[in-house]
Amino acid sequence: MFTFEAAKYPTASGVYLMKGEAGTVFYVGKAKNLRSRLRSYFSEHGDNRPQIRFLLKRVHDIETIVTDTEKEALILENTLIKKYRPRYNINLRDDKTYLSLRLDPRQEFPMLQLVRRVRRDGALYFGPYASSTAVRATLQEIYRIFPLRRHPWESCRSRSRPCLYYQIGQCSAPCHGKISAEDYQRLVDGALALLAGRESEVVESLQHQMAAAAERMAFEEAARLRDQLRAIEQTVERQKVVEAGGGDQDVVGLHREGGEVELAILFVREGKVIDRRSYNLEWRLDEEELLSTFLQRFYGRDVCIPDRVLLPFLPEGSEVLAEWLSEQRGKKVQVLAPLRGTRRKLVALAARNAEESFRERGSRREARQGVLEEIARRLHLTRFPHRIECFDISNVQGRFSVGSMAVLSDGEPDKGAYRHFRIRSVEGSDDYASLYEVLRRRLERGLREESLPDFILMDGGKGQLNIVCTVLDELNLTGRIDVAGIAKSRVMANVRGKAVERSEERFFLPGRKNSVNLRQGSPALFMLERLRDEAHRFAITHHRKLRRRSTLGSVLEEIPGVGEKRRKALLKHFGSLKAVQAASLDELRAMPGLPAALAERIHAAFQERKTS
């Protein structure tokens, strides 16, 4: 039993790590005064909420790391959360970075790119966009109005004629000399103005060009400009102005209910709401700490940081947070909690969005709850399947064997918990042995970290089911985790032996001779089939990536003059094998320490591979 002794802990700023019985870090926090913060948890008159009491009962040790400043503590906390992935810290389910649009004005004919990382590289970034659907819709609008090039310059120039987008009027084909640099720059300026929210500038310019075209009787050009104007008007109509001249700001709203907090972020760019994102979080610790940690996690993922972040209240250390955000962005960022005026109304709007999102999530949760109850009933599970894990193995003739784990948390895909496993101990194509290794590694780690699934679904029949049962027996987990195998439907002859029919998906359970079927078309069957397909997709995708890397790597190493040291230098300079392959001859020649002749050989080798 852990006994808290305040005198043991420093009064300086720093980070604290709460550890469980096996030494596993389950919570990481920061504080301006470590002793004061920890005392607030353990004192008699401290926070008595059930979730706090629950958390503190699991503490067996607390480690502290002192820092010189609060900002250092903030940065260290972020680093440790990424390293340990503590169970009770905020987990943003969509742990991928958001999409942004990138345009490098230094290129001769710039193009728009979809990127997930915002770098301080001199390029212009627009976003973030919470969904790929939203950003692709924006791109389509831009290409319709301003037909910028769509493909990398090298691949464009290697074509014998312009691409299909040129034929349908959505690319100006600068790679084949179909537009002058001056006219192309006008398209770029228009696209940038539209993305920055300066539609009036674009409209005024197009109206002037249209009038000039009509005056010189260039009616086709005038009609094209008219269509561009109409497209802009339709786009602008769909965007709501919430603060004229308000610039770029992210607005955070918060809704509390029970032991949960719903946070909504409105992305406001040039006074218009361009997107929204919401997160449902467990309310373990105090609100200030929750909000501060959330902002660190959110903005620590290479997203576009705006001029201002508007909050419902200022958490402790908001000045440090603003300083950190400014450093990340390279420009000053304000963190504000407005008390009145338009900005206060924006925060209230974000709070209403958070509440609405919570209600919608609750309705979906109730529906998923019913589906999970049906799964538990039909598959004779001994516990409610809050967390379901499905495993799959992928290899080609025993090469690049990988395992995958897809996860459902309360019936919803938890993509942040998906895992790949490189098979270490199995030579050749032995799916059963590979599956044994993957399950053993996963469950041993689960025992150490006290994070076991409720239900394991195997992609396969009795053979795969026997493997998981063996692993559970060896780890004394039989009875603590439910298991089943899902076998794909079979093709069977009908009674006349002529036509073929497809049987239902079959579920195999331990200790049962016959399989169990779920009703065709039922939500329960759909949920489990989707999970099985996700595990398969995740394994195949990673397997293809490994094969592609290996192929590219072998091409690189076969080039005379490229050894292990040179290969590492190329990867460090360009960032990836794919980037080396896509590099132009000029970019290769510009790499420090790479002889011009070798740069030409590398470029020629990859060009030959493209055309072969």
From Swiss-Prot:
It holds the Pfam family UvrC_RNaseH_dom. The UvrABC repair system catalyzes the recognition and processing of DNA lesions. UvrC both incises the 5' and 3' sides of the lesion. The N-terminal half is responsible for the 3' incision and the C-terminal half is responsible for the 5' incision. HAMAP family: UvrC. Its main location: cytoplasm. Belongs to the UvrC family. It is found in: Cytoplasm. CDD domains: GIY-YIG_UvrC_Cho (cd10434). One of its GO terms (biological process) is nucleotide-excision repair. The gene is uvrC. One of its GO terms (cellular component) is cytoplasm. It comes from Syntrophotalea carbinolica (strain DSM 2380 / NBRC 103641 / GraBd1). This is UvrABC system protein C. Residues 11-90 form the GIY-YIG domain. Residues 200-235 form the UVR domain. GO terms for molecular function: DNA binding; excinuclease ABC activity.
